Structure formats: C-alpha cells, structure tokens
C-alpha cells in the first residue's frame, strides 16, 4: 500500500511540474510597438495573468532584454490589427495558451521559444512566415496547424518539441528549414506538401518519424535529413538527384532501393542502420559513396548495378552479416577499408581492377583465400591487416612492392610466393605472421621497411638477398625460431633492434661492408655465443666474440650466451652501446677508466648480474640502462658519493637497493684464488666459480672448498633457497629431525612449495648424502613449482644406460628429464656409461650440476621475463 501511494505521489508531482505555479500577478501595462516610440502597440497584464496586446502593426523584438511579462503571463490575447510577433517576445515564458489575430502575418525568431506549458496553437490564415526557432523547445506542445498562407518556415522552428505528435503543413513551401523537427520523438508520421523541392539538413534528425512519403518534386535530401530518426521504411522518389551526408544514418530502415537518378552521393548515407538487411542500387549508378553502408551490421543482401565503376572508402566496412557480394566486371576501383570487418568468405575482384586502397580487405575474420588480379603493380597499405584466417594468397605477377602492414597480423598465413618483380617489402608488411614458415625473398629485392618481418616467430631461417643495402629498425625482431642469419656482402647498415629476440641463433657473421650497427640490434638473442666480423671490415671487429668498433671507442654487442660469468670491458672503450649486454648471463662486469657513457637498456635482462665496476669519469648512464630485470647487489664506483649524486640528478636513481662502494675498485678472486684445495686446471672450476660468485655456495671454513666432499640433502635445498632470494617460510613442516638452524627455513620452504618430500612421514635426513636421483627430483621440482617451467615433454630413454632400470620409480621421470637436459650425463667406466642413480654427488659435482641447471633455467627465465619484443 505504501509503495502504491508513493507511485501515485510521484506521478502527481511530475504532472504538476508541467503546470505553471499559481501566484498573485501584479497588474501592469506599457507600450511594446516596433514603430516610432512604440505606442503603436500597448500591453496590459491583469491580476489573473492574462496578457493582452492591442494596437496595430508589429510588436517590438526582445532579443537583448527580457520582456516584463515573461514570468507572469499565463494567457495571451493578441488583438486584431497586430501583424507581427516580435523576436523573443514570449520566449521562456509561463504562458499556457495564445490567441492570435487574423491580421497576423509574421512570427519572428524565437517568439514562442521555450514556452514549456503551451500545449497547442493555431495560426490564422494570412500568416506567411514562421521564424527561426519560433516554437522550439515547447516541450508540452502536442499539435500545430499551419495555414495555407505560410510561405516560409525558419530553421529549427519546432526543434525540441518532444511531445509534438501532429503537424499540418500546407501546400506552398518549397523547402523546410534545417533541424525543423529535430528531437521531436512523438512525431511518428507527417504529410509533406507536394510543393517541396528539397528536404533541408537535419529536418527530421533524431525525430520519431517512422513512415513518410517524400513528394515527387523533391530533388535534394540534405545532410542528416533523417539522421537517428525512427524511420523504418522509405521510398526515394525517382526525381531525387542529391542525397547528403548521413541522410539516413542510424535509422531503423530494413531495406532500401537507391534510384538511378542520384548523381551526387554524400558520405555515410545509410551508415549504422543496424536493422538494414537488403540494399539495391539501381542500374545507372556508378559509385558506392564513402561509408554508404558502414556498420550496417545486419546487411546481408546487396545488389550492385553493372554500371558501377567504384566502391569508395569504408563503403561496407563493419557489415558483419555480409558474407557474399557479386562485384560487377565494371567495378575497378576500391577505396580504403571498403570491405573491412565484413564476413565475406570469397572476394573476386574483376580482371580490370586498377586500384585497391588502404585496408580494403582488412580485419575480415573468415576470409581464407584470395587471388589478386594481374595488372595491379601496387596495392594500398594494410590490405589484409588482421585477417587471422587468411591462408592462401595469390599475388599479381607484376607487383612491385609488398605494401606497409599488408599482411600484418595474418596469424594463419604459413607460406607465400612473392613475385620476382617485388623490389621492396614495406614497414610491418608481415609483422605478427606467427605461422609463416615459407617465404623466399626475390633476388631483386632492394629493401625492407621498419619491422617488415617483426615477430614472424616461425621463420626457420633468415637469408637477406644480395641487393639489400640497409636493414631497417626491427626488421626481423622477434623471429625466435630462426636458427641462422645470412647477410650479404654489400650490406652497409643494420638498424636498431634489427635481429632482437632471434633467440635460436647461435652465431652470426657481419659482412665487411657493414658500416653501422644500431643499438639493441642483437638484443634478446639468448643463444648467441659468437659474433664474427671479417678482417676487411673498416668499422667493426670482434675480440673473443664480443663486437666492438675498430677504433676501440664503442662496445657494440656482447653475445648473451658467450661462455663465462665475468667480463672486463677492454681499456679504451668510451661508450657501451644501447642493449650491448642485453640478457647476458654475466655475474660480474668491470668497466675501464676510459668509459664515459652507458646507453639505454645496456644491461637489461641481466638477471644474474650482481657486481658492477664503474669509473669515476663516467658522465652519462641512461635511465633505463640497468633497472629492468637486474639484481645488482654491489657497485664499485671510482668516484665520490657527490659525483654519483650528480650523475643521477637528471633521473631518480640507478641503483635502488644496491650497495655502492665509493672510491673503490672491484676485486673478486676466482675460485682457484679463494680456495687452496681447488686446482686452477680443474674441470669443475667454472661450476665452483659460478656458485661461489653468485652466492649459491661457499667454502667449508678457512681457505677450503672441499671439492671432493659429500653434498648433503640440506645443502642442495639451501642452494635453491639462496637462488630464490631466501623467501619467508612459515611453520608447518612434519619433519622432526631439522635440528640445525642454518637449514630449517630452507627445508620448510621447499616442503611447503612441493619441491621436496621426506624420507619418511616425519624425517627429512638433512645431513644424509644426496643421491644423483634425489638431485634430479629436487631440481625438476624446483623448476616446475617455483619457476613455472615444464620440461616434461622431453625425456631421455633410460634403458640406454646399463643401470637404467635401477632408477627408483618415484625418480624415473625427473631423472629422464635431467638426462635429456644434460644435467646428468652418467659416469664412464670400463664397462660402459652408468647413471649410478643411488650414488652420491661430491661438492664439485653438485656445483657443476647446479651451474648447468642455473644456465638452463636462466635462459628460460630471460625468455619469460622479457616484457615484449623490442
């Protein structure tokens, strides 16, 4: 009951809002004529709110000042003899009714604009002109009758009359003002006079009109004439010659026939008519105009005339129900994005096609094959952009270039034949063609645009034709499966990030002709171990596989997989190029006193880097030189704290959380120098050196490492715990034999993360020697549970080892994975190579296995950690 009462009160309040409030009116009077001193017309306002005009001639305009009766008048009586209502004379007033004289001829601009309580009005015979916005925004007005005498109806005369449902327009006017009924949503139908010759701009825009008959004499339908109206059906007369921009856009039309008489088409005439299903263009029409049917998402049936010569840009763009269309043989020109976003499955361009604009067939979700007609020598950019199902393409035999982004994002395209005539492959031409494996560049190819083959991750190899002189920025960036790169003699420059993330390439030869190499050219090539430059190159050379300028000024590129964990930048180097050490596995880098500049992203992705030496004379470090994916713990800086502060001033800080040793030089001895029981020639030196330098292992006391000593289960877990940064572990282990403090946290952490289990329900046996199969289980568990790496797809055949059957069932998968990864290789004996799964591991063996494991997961982690290809 309470809810019902509230509803009634709400309705009453809304109704009352439409009625002017009753209040006492103070009588007043005055003159308001437009002639001489204004005395030709007088006005009188009585106590009841009745406003009476008497006199002869015109009432004055009130354009710049409000009339004195604006908020008092309720009923208006205009006396006989008055010929004109002045501009703004009743605008915004509270009047509810207006009585007009038979002598009236003109209603001026906004004379009754905004009379929101006025519900109806009758204009007497004799009225010739209804001025601009004369009754606009009269939101209670429901009907208007115009007399036969009306000759002119001004722009926006009835705009915003949201309750207007009935209008009678007499014969006589040749056109209706612009925006005449705009926003009149209750106006569902109207009878137009046969005298009309044109429908002006936005005359029925955003109007509720549903059905209408356009008079036969109309030749022009203006811009937005029916835009966003409720129109459901239209017959365009044969006499119409001009249709303006968006004339029927966003209406509710379901079908349309465009007559042959149309000679001038505007843009987007039927765009966004989401109910439009059928469109017929009559014979004689020569062009589908710009965006004519754009985003008509229900359009499925289109008939084009045999006289058609061109389909303009975006003509059918976004018509997602359009699956078939027959193109006339006469249609030879297609504008930008003409069919973009449609669901056409088969497009057959006529043999005489002479022009395909930008993106004509772009973003078509189901297009799988296409043949472009011979005769085309060039096509627009982005022609097939984003066509994710496109698999087969036949290009015209005379094509001279693959246009910019022509096949960008065509993720199903596996192979393509380029005509011998192709001399240039444009910017991003094949970018993101992730399935492309088979493409042969023509012998006559002269160049590539930026990122031409960007992220073609399935390309098996890269061979640059002999005629190419420059490689643009990012041209083969992200071709991660390419195992080789072949560059021609004659190549003079390699652009910025040209081969970035070609992660399967292990070596590269730089031709003698190369004069410049851009920053990050070889960044992200995580398997690259050697860069070679011919002795005849005047600009570059390599020292131990590291690329530098021949004058010794710049270190250009350090191969990410070059052996070793320390590197001393050669004396004399002044600059480290952008991305020079990108993704390396180095732990310590020493820079010479000659160094002055470190370029952008120089040490990005160096997740192993812990120690860095910088000279006092360094002048510039790029803000992002080493912040990303670096975990430098110690910087040895030859200068003072004040010098470092000035160096950092342009930015914020280079070494957040890093210990900076001022006025210092880095001295980190090798394992052989640290430990008296480690032979400098030992096979285990690389493993011991890495584990000690990376903080994974330490000595056993004094100057001893005990390389032949036993490795315990707790020690292996502790090493992995250190590798993970000693994360916090919570109580919850079932093991009762964890007596020593140094390993309690690490074992609890490993158990909680599913890396290890006990030797029984309550014991872990931390001091027991770790077996080879236990190491395998622990390492594979760590890779999966902590790092998220899955090596299960590649398992070795353990039956190849004489003792393969002796591997415990619980360890069999992990051992098979470890052998396949090269972490466990077996022990050589006179009787063959044995796994010895239950055998122990010495500390030097453990260091070697852990170093191999770290190198393996480090590569995978660097691949995972990269934000994106450059």
Question: Which residue stretches match the model-derived regions?
Answer:
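Bacterial N-terminal signal peptides
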Residues: 9-17
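Sec-dependent signal peptide cleavage junction
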Residues: 16-28
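Surface-exposed repetitive/solenoidal architectures
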Residues: 25-94, 113, 203, 225, ...
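Structural signature of tandem-repeat unit edges
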Residues: 50-56, 71-84, 93-106, 116-129, ...
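Bacterial N-terminal signal peptides that target proteins for export
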Residues: 1-9
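Feature responds to low-complexity, polar/acidic, surface-exposed segments characteristic
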Residues: 669-685, 693, 698-745, 753-773, ...
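Consensus positions within tandem repeat domains that build extended binding/scaffold surfaces
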Residues: 86-89, 109-111, 131-134, 154-157, ...
């Amino acid at each position: 009951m309470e809810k019902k009462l509230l509803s009634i009160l709400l309705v009453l309040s809304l109704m009352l809002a439409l009625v002017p409030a009753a209040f006492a009116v103070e009588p007043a009077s005055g003159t308001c004529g437009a002639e001489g001193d204004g005395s030709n017309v007088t006005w009188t306002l009585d106590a009841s709110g009745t406003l009476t005009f008497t006199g002869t001639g015109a009432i004055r305009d009130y354009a710049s000042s409000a009339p004195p009766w604006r908020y008092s008048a309720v009923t208006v009586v205009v006396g006989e003899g008055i010929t004109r209502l002045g501009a703004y004379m009743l605008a915004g007033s509270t009047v509810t009714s207006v009585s007009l004289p038979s002598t009236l001829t003109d209603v001026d601009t906004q004379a009754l604009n905004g009379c929101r309580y006025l519900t109806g009005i009758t204009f007497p015979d004799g009225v010739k002109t209804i001025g601009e916005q004369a009754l606009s925004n009269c939101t209670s007005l429901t009907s208007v009758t115009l007399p036969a005498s009306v000759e002119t109806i001004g722009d926006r005369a009835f705009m915003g009359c949201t309750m207007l449902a009935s209008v009678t327009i007499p014969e006589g006017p040749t056109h209706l003002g612009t925006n005449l009924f705009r926003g009149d949503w209750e106006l569902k139908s109207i009878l137009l006079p046969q005298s009309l010759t044109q429908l002006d701009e936005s005359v029925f825009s955003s109007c509720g009109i549903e059905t209408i008959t356009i008079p036969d004499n109309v030749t022009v339908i203006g811009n937005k004439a029916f835009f966003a109206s409720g129109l459901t059906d239209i017959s365009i007369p044969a006499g119409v010659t001009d249709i303006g921009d968006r004339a029927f856009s966003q209406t509710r039309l379901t079908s349309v026939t465009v007559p042959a008489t149309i000679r001038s088409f505007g843009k987007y005439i039927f765009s966004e008519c989401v109910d439009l299903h059928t469109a017929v263009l009559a014979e004689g029409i020569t062009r589908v105009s710009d965006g004519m049917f754009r985003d008509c998402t229900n359009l499925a049936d289109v008939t084009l005339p045999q006289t058609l010569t061109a389909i303009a840009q975006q003509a059918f763009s976004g018509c997602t129900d359009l699956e078939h269309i027959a193109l006339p043989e006469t249609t030879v020109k297609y504008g930008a994005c003409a069919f973009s976003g449609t669901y056409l499955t088969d497009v057959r361009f006529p043999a005489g096609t002479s022009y395909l604009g930008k993106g004509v067939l772009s973003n078509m979700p189901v297009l799988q094959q296409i043949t472009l007609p011979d005769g085309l020598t060039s096509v627009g950019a982005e022609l097939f952009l984003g066509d994710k199902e496109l698999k087969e393409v036949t290009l015209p035999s005379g094509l001279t270039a693959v246009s910019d982004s022509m096949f960008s994002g065509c993720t199903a395209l596996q192979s393509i034949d380029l005509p011998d005539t192709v001399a240039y492959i444009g910017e991003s031409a094949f970018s993101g063609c992730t399935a492309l494996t088979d493409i042969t560049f023509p012998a006559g190819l002269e160049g590539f645009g930026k990122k031409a083959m960007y992220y073609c991750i399935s390309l098996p190899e890269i061979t640059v034709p002999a005629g190419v002189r420059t490689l643009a920025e990012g041209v083969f960036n992200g071709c991660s499966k390419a195992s080789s790169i072949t560059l021609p003699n004659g190549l003079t420059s390699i652009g910025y990030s040209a081969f970035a993330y070609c992660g399967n390439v292990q070596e590269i030869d730089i031709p003698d002709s190369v004069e410049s190499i851009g920053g990050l050219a070889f960044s992200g090539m995580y398997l690259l171990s050697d860069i070679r430059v011919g002795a005849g190159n005047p600009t570059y050379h390599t020292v131990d596989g590291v690329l530098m300028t021949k004058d010794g000024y710049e270190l250009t590129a350090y191969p990410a997989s070059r052996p070793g964990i320390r590197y001393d930048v050669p004396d004399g180097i002044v600059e480290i190029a952008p991305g020079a050490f990108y993704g390396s596995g180095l732990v310590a880098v020493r820079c010479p006193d000659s160094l002055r500049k470190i370029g952008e992203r120089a040490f990005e992705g160096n997740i192993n880097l812990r120690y860095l030496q910088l000279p006092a004379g360094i002048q510039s470090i790029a803000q992002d030189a080493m912040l990303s994916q670096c975990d430098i713990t110690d910087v040895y800086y030859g200068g003072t704290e004040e010098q470092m502060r000035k160096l950092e001033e342009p930015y914020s800080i280079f070494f957040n959380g890093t210990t900076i040793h001022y006025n210092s030089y880095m001295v980190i001895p090798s394992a052989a120098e640290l430990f008296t029981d480690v032979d400098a020639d030992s096979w285990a030196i690389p493993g011991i050196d890495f584990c000690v330098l990376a903080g994974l292992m330490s000595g056993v006391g004094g100057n001893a490492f005990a390389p032949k000593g036993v490795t315990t289960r707790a020690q292996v877990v502790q090493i992995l715990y250190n590798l993970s940064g000693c994360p916090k572990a919570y109580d919850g282990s079932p093991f009762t034999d964890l007596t020593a403090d140094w390993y309690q946290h690490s074992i609890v952490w490993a158990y909680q993360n599913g890396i290890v289990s006990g030797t029984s329900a309550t014991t872990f046996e931390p001091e027991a020697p770790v077996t080879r199969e236990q190491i395998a289980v622990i390492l594979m568990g760590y890779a999966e549970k902590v790092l998220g790496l899955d090596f299960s797809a590649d398992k070795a055949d353990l039956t190849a080892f004489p003792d393969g059957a002796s591997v415990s069932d619980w360890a069999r998968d992990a051992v098979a994975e470890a052998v396949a990864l090269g972490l466990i290789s077996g022990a050589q004996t006179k009787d063959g190579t044995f796994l010895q799964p239950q055998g122990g591991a010495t500390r030097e063996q453990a260091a070697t296995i852990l170093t191999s494991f770290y190198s393996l997961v480090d590569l995978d982690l660097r691949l995972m950690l990269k934000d994106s290809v450059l």
